[in-house]
Amino acid sequence: MTEFKPIKEGKVREIYDNGDSLIMVATDRISAFDVILKNKVTNKGKVLTQMSKFWFDYTRDLLPNHMLSVDVQDMPEFFRQPQFTGNSMMCRKLTMLPVECIVRGYITGSGWASYQKTGKVCGIQLPEGLKESEKLPEPIYTPSTKAEIGDHDENISYEQSIDVLEKLFPGKGEEYATKLRDYTIALYKKCAEYALSRGIIIADTKFEFGLDEEGNVILGDEMLTPDSSRFWPLEGYEAGHGQPSFDKQFVRNWLLANPDSDYDLPQDVIDKTIAKYEEAYEMLTGKKL
């Protein structure tokens, strides 16, 4: 059996080169505030991979994505070991674009903090009088740069995203920046509407895109997982305060309340975290993991 070593290790994912494709493995690691925590969250990698698969299938009519298969039988023998089952995705190779495409449909988190001070979120002027967690009149696109592990992503304007892409792809910056913005908002609207019908509010999320060999923009990375999105229960939703969530916000809140924890979570927080991830998966897909 041929051994494979990751060519890249992110905060949560490991990427393996499979010749004309890549194999992306979602581990059970969890990160918060750009730090990898000491604990593993059992089954988390499976939730991320299967949730992404669901959304990639759901949005394929809107634009192509990089997913080829999540069946380890389609992958080399090395990936048929138990630790890869359910949490591995074979993907097309793309040239990834260095812009994190964030879309916000509700005002919360850092966006709410910024709005209270300036009336703006990432430089975008919003109407007066919005409450915390309120739905925005229209989703807003707030891109950021992609940071290395340990660094913080930096918010940029749409205009700055043109400059970032123009430097890498002369003559194409505006075209690519516009596609990223328009695809991001279209994907969010389609998926947020579906999620609402299943009892979940997608408050915000981020997408990442790449280029195929012909220069077409393709959706990559993960899609609408509890790691990349804020999911709130529709039941009991009321603007004016923070919302309970099915995502990493639960972990962030615990860390904020326990600043001396040294990023070491107690077992009950780990158990509640995976329960929330699995509940979100079941509500959205109608299936158990």
Regions found by a protein language model. Name each.
Residues M1-E148, S261-L289:
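Active-site loop/lid in soluble adenylation, ligation, and acyl-transfer enzymes
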Residues K117-K120, L126-E175, L219, M223-L284:
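Anionic ligand-binding catalytic core segments
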Residues S21, M96-P98, R198-I202, E214-V217:
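Coil-to-beta-strand transition motifs
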Residues V103, I202-M223:
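Conserved metal-phosphate-binding beta-hairpin within the catalytic cores
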Residues R60-H66, K190-I202, G215, T285-L289:
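Surface-exposed helix-capping loop/turn segments at secondary-structure junctions
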Residues F33, W112-A113, E214, S228-R230:
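Intrinsically disordered, low-complexity acidic/polar segments
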Residues F169-A203:
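A long amphipathic alpha-helix within ATP-dependent nucleotide-binding catalytic cores
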